[in-house]
């Protein structure tokens, strides 16, 4: 965890940390309390009324943010033949099969996302123990095991964010950069929240969207009113 000093303390006192705000107000406070000398990531943390220990309440998916993430994502694609050519043309950073498997087995991991055509999963399985713990394994639920490689590469490059609910129903993601400004960050946050609400399991009872907090990498968390968000998404 980053070390926090006087700047964090001073900034966190510029708003009421116990109050909940509209999304636009909360983003404004995050921008006002950002003090780092680098372009901080805009983070969102959501507490959901689900129990991920139950398979039917495990939420794992992805969303393409309207303004991207601000990060350069290196995409590796396992494909052959025409699909290999398609992946290269679509802008994949690395494309191959057994050659990439051998390279990864040797310790090379200079990529951020992986995609595989279904016929390559037998090959990819050889390095499952390497990719799996690092959340780099192609996954059909996330759309990264597909023959439509060009579409997926485009989505990843344009700002596709994968997410998964963790213990205690907590879900978090980086959904932009502070330099984006209020309008773009608000739009990204709303798109992310809309996706989460769409994924509500039928077995989830009671309040689903319990709390939402946004922050910059080094800044204090700002609470967003979940009631306001639910009403906003329904409009």
Curated annotation (Swiss-Prot):
One GO CC term, this protein: large ribosomal subunit
UniProt cross-references to Pfam families, sorted A to Z: Ribosomal_L1 (PF00687)
InterPro entries reported for this sequence: Ribosom_uL1_bac-type (IPR005878), Ribosomal_uL1 (IPR002143), Ribosomal_uL1-like (IPR023674), Ribosomal_uL1/biogenesis (IPR028364), Ribosomal_uL1_3-a/b-sand (IPR016095), Ribosomal_uL1_CS (IPR023673)
Superkingdom classification of source: Bacteria
Keyword terms: Repressor, Ribonucleoprotein, Ribosomal protein, RNA-binding, rRNA-binding, Translation regulation, tRNA-binding
Gene Ontology terms: biological process: regulation of translation; translation
A molecular-function term among this protein's GO annotations: structural constituent of ribosome
Quaternary structure and partners: Part of the 50S ribosomal subunit.
Homology family: Belongs to the universal ribosomal protein uL1 family.
NCBIfam families: rplA_bact (TIGR01169)
Purpose: Binds directly to 23S rRNA. The L1 stalk is quite mobile in the ribosome, and is involved in E site tRNA release. Protein L1 is also a translational repressor protein, it controls the translation of the L11 operon by binding to its mRNA.
PANTHER family given in the database record: 54S RIBOSOMAL PROTEIN L1, MITOCHONDRIAL, LARGE RIBOSOMAL SUBUNIT PROTEIN UL1M
Protein name: Large ribosomal subunit protein uL1
Lineage summary: Bacteria, Pseudomonadati, Thermodesulfobacteriota, Desulfobulbia, Desulfobulbales
Gene: rplA
